[in-house]
Each structure stands twice: as C-alpha cells, then as structure tokens.
Amino acid sequence: MKLQQKLAILADAAKYDASCASSGSTNKSSKNGKGVGSTSSGMGICHSYTPDGRCISLLKVLFTNFCIYECSYCINRASSPVERARFTVEEVVNLTIDFYKRNYIEGLFLSSGIIQSSDYTMEQLVSVARELRKTHDFRGYIHLKTIPDASPELLRMAGLYADRLSINVELPSKQSLALYAPEKNPATIKKSMIVLRDHIDESKESRKKSKKIISSSSGSVQKNKQSSKFIYSPAGQSTQMIIGADQSSDAKILTLSNNLYSKYNMRRVYYSAFSPIPHSAEQLPAQSPPLIREHRLYQADWLLRFYGFDVNEITASSTAVNDSGPAGMLDLDVDPKLAWALRNRHFFPVNINTATREILLRVPGIGAIGANKIIKSRRFKQLRVMDVAKCGLSIKKIEPFIEAVDANPACRLLEDENLKQYFIKKESAQMTLF
C-alpha cells in the first residue's frame, strides 16, 4: 500500500479522538500549478493548544487501525469491516519531518490500535518519539496516546520524549466499560494514570530544585545541573471520555472529571459525543446525543477548574428552572453558570463595587478577565452600570444580576418567573444574525 493511502486511512481513523480539533477548513489543491499554501496533501492536520496558549497545527494520525480489542463503540474494533493500514516507525518519522519542513505542522499527535500486545504497541509509539527527538533533533510538540496495559518502564520512556501523554478513561462508569469494552480494566487505567502522575510530579520537583541550584551556583556548575534535570511530559497528562453511549448523567460525568483533576492532576478532560457506527452493539444508542450537551459539559468543566464551582452546584436539579429531562443533567437551553444563577436568585444582585473576585466570577457574563478589569477600574472610582460595558463585557447579560452606584432597573428582572425565557429569546435573536 502506498504511503499516501495509509495516510488517508489512518488520518481519517484518528478523527474520533477529541484531544485536538480539526481545522475545519476546506482543502484547496495546487495540482494545476496555480496558487500557493495548499495543504491538500497534508491530510491529518489538526489544531491544538499548547500549555502557554498557542494554537498549533499537528499531524494527527494512528500508527495503525488494526486492533485486537472488541470495543463496541469503536470504529476500529477487531470485527469492524473497515479498511486497515499500518505505518512503520520510519514512515511516521519521515512524514512528521517532511510536513514540519514544509511548515504544515508544528508537532505530532500519535495514537494507535492495539496490535500483538500492549507492550509491543507502546514500543512502536515510543520508538517514533525517540527517533524524532534523538536522530532528527525534532523540537516540535509531541502528544502520545499511551496504552494503559503497557509496562511502567515503557510509560516512563514515553514521557521522556513526549510533551504530553494521555490515557483514555473511555466511559463514565465501570459497568459501561465492562459492557462495551470488556478487555479494558478501569483499575489498570487508573493505575497507569498514577504512574504518569508520579513521574510528572517528580519532574516538577526536579525542575524546581534545578532552578534553585542554578540561581545560587556559578556558570560551570549551572551547566552540569541543567543537564541533570529530569524532564517528563512537561505539558502533563490528559484523558478523553465518551458521552451519550450509556445512561450516565452529566452529574456522574462531571464528578468523575473532578476526581480525575484532583487525584490524577489531569491537565484536561476531553468530552467526545458518541457517534453511531455501522454494525455496532444493539445496546448502543442509534443516534448521537445533542452536540450542545458536549458543549455544556465543556462549559461546566471550565467552571469546575477556574471559577470555584462545585459539581453539586452545577448539576443540582430545580423544577422551577429546568423542568424537562432527568435529574443530574445540565440545562441545554442556557449555559451552566446562567442556569446556576437562575436557581440561586437570592445570591443576586451583586454589588460590583464591593464584591470579591470569587463572587464576581459567579455573575453570568463575567469571566476571569472581566472580573480583573472591574476590580482594577473600581480602584479609581465608584462604578456605574455602564462602566461594566467599558470593561469590554456584554451589559445585557450581566445587568439583571448586578447593582452599582447608580440605579439599575434591570435588577427587577430577578423577580420575573420567565427570566430564563428572556435569555433564551435574546440568544435566539442573536443567532439569526449569522
């Protein structure tokens, strides 16, 4: 099989991994000799974000879509009638270097089906990363999907060459995993996550000690100490969870995510809406969950990580606000923070001149940057309602929930039982503009 055929198959097979997003652009060919900038030959290119916030292009492929596992929800499971392909280590390395030199990509995202054994598959992935780093002195970004059943030594080696590692938790519950992916063991997955976490923590401590030594040492000692640093997966570890394949509630999903963040020091939990596949198990749903559910989970995840919200606060059911759907599910009509505000109207209005940053972050429409701007602005004067707009914030969403030095008639909306409809209509009207 030609290399381009392999790339087409294995790039397409990698699209189900949510750990980095595709560019969404339409490829434009330059085969007729006209135009510049074509990446039509660079299939498998996706966008992702580095820890410092930069958006980069990655070559996103599977090493192989052959697999010995029979995961019901996976298009690449052993019994799936899909076209199969497999790269060699050299082919992935050469593709990465070639695309990098053409300025198509800035890094590699590499995953794989399981072939022969977990250790054998992991050895192939590690070999790709090692070859790139050692032989070609590749200094771009590398994200490796690690195999949970692989030996601790291979997991350790992977982190020496990769910027980020990830192990998929797959499904929100043990029961679902046993039903749909019987070869995968939740205990083994968590054990491997602990191995990665411990190495990452060790690396952080090593870098801290190295910085202290360097700052108090002479130049000759500094060089030796720098080379002795233990650097392991500097961008941390992440995981992915399929939603909508089972009956797990959003509360259960977010509780698991919160546990992954606190116990395993996850840098990111990705949510991937289940996509029905041909010849799948009868127990699996025939339709995908609404895409907005995936979006709401990401919003709720953000509230957990950066806004000081608790899972119970985000997912608490209230018939007065969300009288449709089962308990423990996020409101699909409005974002999670607005849903919380509508359930807790006694918390409002918040005085923007006296509220702490933590309280400001609870106001719908005020994010971390907006809260900082408000706090900075009120050092110089008492803020009026319209001063919030001068901070670059949408006053229409915020004004029912705040009070300022001047009168704010919009606060009366808090007493309106149909306040939720006010926001739904406003969002719908805005969407019709595009």
Locations of regions flagged by a protein language model:
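C-terminal extensions
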Residues: 325-361, 385-434
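Short, charged beta->alpha transition segments
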Residues: 60-61, 90-101
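Flexible, acidic/Gly-rich N-terminal and inter-domain linker regions that tether
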Residues: 1-66, 403, 410-425, 431-434
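Short Fe-S-cluster ligation motifs
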Residues: 97-111, 300
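Conserved, mostly hydrophobic/aromatic
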Residues: 58, 71, 110, 167, ...
